[in-house]
Swiss-Prot record:
The keyword S-adenosyl-L-methionine applies. It comes from the Eukaryota. Keywords: 4Fe-4S, Iron, Iron-sulfur, Metal-binding, Mitochondrion, S-adenosyl-L-methionine, Transferase, Transit peptide. [4Fe-4S] cluster 2 binds at C151, C155, C158. Residues 134-355 form the Radical SAM core domain. [4Fe-4S] cluster 1 binds at C120, C125, C131, S366. Binds 2 [4Fe-4S] clusters per subunit. One cluster is coordinated with 3 cysteines and an exchangeable S-adenosyl-L-methionine. Residues 22-43 are annotated as: Disordered. Its cofactor is [4Fe-4S] cluster. One of its GO terms (molecular function) is lipoate synthase activity. This is Lipoyl synthase, mitochondrial.
């Protein structure tokens, strides 16, 4: 019988390792009887495990007789190739330049000095250079993450740190944040928070206080708040909606069928819809907004159903972006959606009556948020003037 290359490699490596194991075992017999140190104990354990693996595998007779075909013997080089293929190559349309520019470095410096956290940095947003580094500061957008940089939840797509008991909120944070915003002269700012299920109010009053102080120090700055679901406590949604913000955002993240696999178990698709619905009911003039990631294995029908659910509660703005795996510990990318498909969903959103839709591989929930807001407010005013 003629052996294959894989089988020959297996036999050669097996023979060498067994010979080495026997010599090592013989050499260590005397010292072992006198009380083996930890290092020798570990070596003996490895030898035993190796012998067990050999006993479970095919014998020389199995190879000669042809019975070895029933055993799975993987070439180590082939296994390495298979592992590499699991990680899809990043398409060219997802590659971005290194962040730079005077405004970018100034924002970065101020954030560090005032001990603020930004989701732009914590979530490794690919658009940080574009949002922070523009020449016109009035069109720049910064997303400040309040209540610390540690979340009490563990969604499978998110790179933000997690802990059941994060540090207590910084009472000076609302004032520091407002000071930073007024110093930067930004036209639009997004406030977001980690989920703080450890706090009785989920951090709603802390976030609302920050909005109020920003409006006092920088009244011309438009404020968007991207909140959590407050564990379904709609009274906390009321607190946020009445704080004076301009846009109330809460992300669905994905379609209903994938929600249990993508988001933390304490989050829920219907629970998130209720947050957006309540915000609009509390302050009808508020622009409500959500974001959905693509590339997680969702179908077109599921996306359309999600959009229909959002329009049913009068959600105004939706954004679509490509899911990008932050680290190997996070869920894998199922598909890199092509730019043309994102254009399709943008057209579909307008067709369904959304006030605005930002859709593209690198789009995130706060991507060019100021530009989107201004454009849509102007469009809405034009429509109102025509009716008059």
């Amino acid at each position: 019988m003629r052996l294959t290359t894989v089988q020959r490699r297996f036999l050669v490596s097996t023979k060498a390792k067994v010979s080495g194991a026997s010599i090592s075992s013989t050499a260590n017999t005397g010292s072992a009887s006198a009380g083996a140190p930890n290092g020798q104990t570990r070596r003996r354990r490895r030898i035993t495990e190796f012998k067990d693996a050999l006993n479970l595998g095919p014998s020389f007779e199995d190879f000669v007789s042809g019975r070895a075909a029933g055993f799975t013997v993987v070439d180590p080089l082939e296994q390495m190739r298979q592992d590499r293929e699991e990680y899809k190559k990043l398409p060219k349309w997802l590659k971005v330049p290194i962040p730079k520019g005077v405004n970018y470095h100034k924002l970065k410096k101020d954030v560090k000095e005032l001990k603020l956290s930004t989701v732009c940095e914590e979530a490794r947003c690919p658009n940080i250079g574009e949002c922070w580094g523009g020449k016109d500061k009035s069109k720049a957008t910064a997303t400040i993450m309040l209540l610390g940089d540690t979340c009490t939840r563990g969604c499978r797509f998110c790179s933000v740190k997690t802990n059941r008991n994060p540090a207590k909120p910084d009472p000076t944070e609302p004032e520091n944040t407002a000071e930073a915003i007024s110093r930067w002269g930004l036209g639009y700012v997004v406030l977001t928070t980690v989920d703080r299920d450890d706090l009785p109010d989920g951090g709603a009053h802390h976030l609302a206080e920050t909005v109020i102080k920003i409006k006092q120090k920088a009244p011309k700055t438009l404020v968007e708040a991207l909140t959590g679901d407050f564990l379904g406590n709609l009274e906390m949604v009321d607190v946020m909606a009445k704080s004076g913000l301009d846009v109330y955002a809460h992300n669905l993240e994905t379609v209903e069928a994938l929600t249990p696999h993508v988001r933390d178990r304490r989050a829920g698709y219907r629970q998130s819809l209720n947050v957006l619905k309540r915000a609009k009911e509390t302050v009808p003039s508020l622009i409500t907004k959500t974001s959905v990631m693509l590339g997680l294995g969702e179908t077109d029908d599921q996306i359309i159903q999600t959009m229909q659910d959002l329009r049913a509660i009068n959600c105004d703005v939706i954004t679509f972006g490509q899911y990008m795996r932050p680290t190997k510990r996070h869920m894998k990318v199922v598909e890199y959606v092509r730019p043309e498909k994102f254009d399709y969903w943008k057209d579909k959103a307008k067709e369904m009556g959304f006030l605005y839709c930002a859709s593209g591989p690198l789009v995130r929930s706060s991507y060019k948020a100021g530009e989107a807001f201004i454009e849509n407010v102007l469009n809405k005013r034009k429509q109102d003037n025509k009716r008059i």
